[in-house]
């Protein structure tokens, strides 16, 4: 993390000016936070020794359909869980949350037996307590595609987008709170156990969609992961959940493909394009090019 004076930081990121009314005196320590793919955040330490993270609203947020106000609503609603950072201040320029001390995990740092109970706690939280409009898979992927400005019209990317531009025809389950990015890089192990950060994509949706993303990120086989998850939640109809996860899998892969194409457009980093190609190839390699049930 790079260090800056408060004035230097505000020159680099004018959104920080929104905090002048929050801090009685300027933060004494200001650092950029590394690790996040979506946006550049700031770690701020007040003169009282309290640490915060400033999560700005930017063109990147708009490109990925991220709302800091929605993120604030989620964090405020789940405060009783003591699972995420405490939201402190929200402004049209960004969101200030408490800094979560501890070690950001890597894949070897957490196993599925510890990860899935965290997912279950999130999913089981009363959806009625979270004041959000339900997540729309179609709206999200259409937004990503429109942000790409016809750049991939006539390519395999468009063919896959069109092929998987529908919600799966499976038996519905009630919408629940989903994190949508529950990878090890968003888990911090500290004195109070493991906490979850970066709730910017969170929403109310089919929890099997979130479970699909979780198993995909953790590289866990579907049957194994679904069985363990259902055991944790006391769900008897495992087949219903396996069917849902399998149906969501190619759709989450296509959504990730579009996300990486958009990231490549925004940052011009070949690594993002490589990741998009990997998802494209994966969709065809698994015969999803020929099966859209």
Model segments located where?
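ATP/Mg2+ or Mg2+-diphosphate-binding catalytic cores
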Residues: 3-4, 155, 258-293
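An alpha-helical support segment within catalytic cores of ATP-dependent transferases
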Residues: 8-26, 127-180, 190, 237, ...
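ATP-binding pocket architecture of kinase catalytic cores
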Residues: 32-135, 155
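Active-site acidic catalytic loop and adjacent metal/ATP-binding pocket
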Residues: 34-46, 50-54, 165-209
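Glycine-rich, phosphate-binding/catalytic loops in enzymes
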Residues: 71, 195, 212-214, 274
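A general structural signal marking secondary-structure boundaries and capping sites
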Residues: 82, 122-129, 168, 233, ...
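Active-site activation/catalytic loop segments of kinase-like enzymes and analogous catalytic loops
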Residues: 208-237, 250-267, 280-282
């Amino acid at each position: 993390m790079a260090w800056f004076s408060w004035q230097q930081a505000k020159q680099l990121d004018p959104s920080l000016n929104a905090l002048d009314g929050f801090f009685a005196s300027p933060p004494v320590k200001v650092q950029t936070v590394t690790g996040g793919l979506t946006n550049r955040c700031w770690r701020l330490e007040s003169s009282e020794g309290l640490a915060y993270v400033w999560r700005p609203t930017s063109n990147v947020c708009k490109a990925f359909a991220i709302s800091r106000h929605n993120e604030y609503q989620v964090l405020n609603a789940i405060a009783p869980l003591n699972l995420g950072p405490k939201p402190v201040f929200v402004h049209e320029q960004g969101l200030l949350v408490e800094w979560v001390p501890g070690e950001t995990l890597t894949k070897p740092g957490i196993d599925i037996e510890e990860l899935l109970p965290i997912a279950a706690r999130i999913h089981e939280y009363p959806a009625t307590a979270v004041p959000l409009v339900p997540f729309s898979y179609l709206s999200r992927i259409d937004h990503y595609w429109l942000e790409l400005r016809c750049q991939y019209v006539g390519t395999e990317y468009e063919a896959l987008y069109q092929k998987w531009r529908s919600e799966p025809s499976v038996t519905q389950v009630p919408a629940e709170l989903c994190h949508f990015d529950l990878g090890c890089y968003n888990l911090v192990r500290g004195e109070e156990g493991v906490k979850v950060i970066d709730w910017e994509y969170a929403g109310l949706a089919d929890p099997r969609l979130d479970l699909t993303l979780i198993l995909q990120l953790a590289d866990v086989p579907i049957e194994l992961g679904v069985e363990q998850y259902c055991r944790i939640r006391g769900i008897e109809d495992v087949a219903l959940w396996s069917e849902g996860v399998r149906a969501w899998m190619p759709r989450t892969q296509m959504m990730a493909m579009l996300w990486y194409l958009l990231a490549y457009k925004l940052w011009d980093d070949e690594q993002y394009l490589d990741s998009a190609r990997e998802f494209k190839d994966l969709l065809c390699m698994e015969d999803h090019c020929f099966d859209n049930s």
